Regions:
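A structural signal for short, hydrophobic/glycine-enriched beta-strand patches
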Residues: 1-175
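A structured, mid-to-C-terminal "fold-capping" secondary-structure block
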Residues: 161-202
Length: 202
């Protein structure tokens, strides 16, 4: 059976993904950087987190990610260790070590943030994760924490420019796989529309 995520998107779908999934947000200083864990492109994630820290873009960070194939250490432990080695103070980085998916990243992290800082003291969050997952990070956060302002920074190691993702077979497969999750996940209540008003603007 052919993987439906290997389909060749037409021009309309490419344009829709570029406009509605690969969202660019202005980045301004935020209260919290939310680092969504991974085993892939860890160094690039850490590079971006360190750049944001040096530029004064966040006061606190949380790294979320459990033990997944590839290491006996949690994704959180690996990423936080690298962030600290690059100069971000350990005491500024909260830890969540159980999450196995994006929903759990958020659900398991909120009580940790609340205990350490207080959710009411956070007004803005920068989401940091993979390019192909893109809008689903803030959509997941918006489902469980609608009150805060959300910004999005994404990274990847593909040599293909982001807007030309459809010209690289693996980049395209990942992008379409994530894009195909959006409507079913909204219908199931796993994520919420973000940016607010996006549905009206279609």
């Amino acid at each position: 059976m052919q993987d439906r995520h290997h389909r060749c998107p037409d021009e309309a779908e490419i344009a829709a993904i570029n406009a509605r999934h690969l969202i660019d947000t202005p980045i301004r200083p935020a209260d919290l950087l939310f680092v969504f864990g991974t085993r892939e492109d860890v160094e690039r994630r850490v590079d971006e987190a360190c750049r944001l820290w040096r530029e004064g873009c966040f006061r606190w960070a949380i790294v979320s990610g459990g033990v997944t194939p590839g290491s006996p250490l949690s994704e959180c432990a690996v990423i936080k260790s690298a962030m600290v080695a690059r100069g971000i103070p350990a005491e500024k980085i909260l830890e969540e070590h159980r999450a196995m998916n994006t929903g759990e990243n958020v659900i398991f992290s909120l009580p940790i943030i609340d205990a350490a800082i207080g959710l009411g003291n956070i007004g803005s969050v920068i989401c940091l994760g993979n390019t192909w997952t893109a809008r689903r990070y803030p959509m997941t956060l918006h489902r469980h924490w609608p009150e805060v302002e959300k910004m999005l920074v994404t990274i990847d190691s593909f040599k293909t420019p982001r807007a030309l993702w459809h010209t690289d077979a693996e980049f395209s497969r990942r992008m379409i796989a994530e894009w195909d999750k959006i409507e079913p996940y909204k219908a199931s209540g796993f994520i919420a529309e973000w940016p607010v008003g996006e549905a009206r603007d279609r």
